[in-house]
């Protein structure tokens, strides 16, 4: 018996804060990443300008890696109107609580569906600045 479902590709997650650009790209290439999905609310960094929106896509392209910024998956969300505080009240961290509330919004759902569809076509890594995924909104994505 064969499985009729399409093959699933893994999604990778990466934070750029502890890596220089050459090491960052080497990690992506080593994992076979074809598309980097930037989920920073503000795709720039004062301390690491090589990861800014105006420079990173070109650097990745030289290595055959596509770049996409998905603002609707970006973090740093405030309280969401219409979502009762107890809905995601299990979060001790207010930032995660607010982001979990944001994840209930249609814009987030559409962006997540787009990410999943993209992940069926290309091996993707989801990127933010935070090196530790469990301290980043990527843990909810």
PLM feature segments, named:
Residues 2-141:
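Residues lining hydrophobic/aromatic ligand-binding pockets adjacent to catalytic sites
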């Amino acid at each position: 018996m064969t499985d009729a479902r399409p093959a699933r590709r893994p999604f990778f997650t990466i934070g750029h804060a502890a890596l220089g650009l050459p090491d960052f790209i080497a990690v992506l290439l080593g994992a076979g990443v074809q598309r980097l999905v930037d989920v920073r609310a503000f795709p720039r960094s004062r301390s690491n300008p090589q990861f800014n929106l105006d420079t990173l896509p070109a650097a990745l392209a030289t290595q055959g890696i596509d770049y996409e910024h998905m603002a609707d998956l970006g973090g740093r969300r405030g309280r969401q109107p219409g979502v009762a505080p107890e809905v995601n009240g299990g979060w001790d961290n207010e930032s995660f609580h607010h982001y979990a509330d944001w994840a209930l919004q249609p814009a987030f759902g559409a962006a997540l569906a787009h990410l999943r569809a993209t992940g069926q076509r290309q091996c993707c890594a989801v990127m933010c600045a935070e090196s530790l995924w469990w301290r980043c909104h990527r843990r909810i994505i």
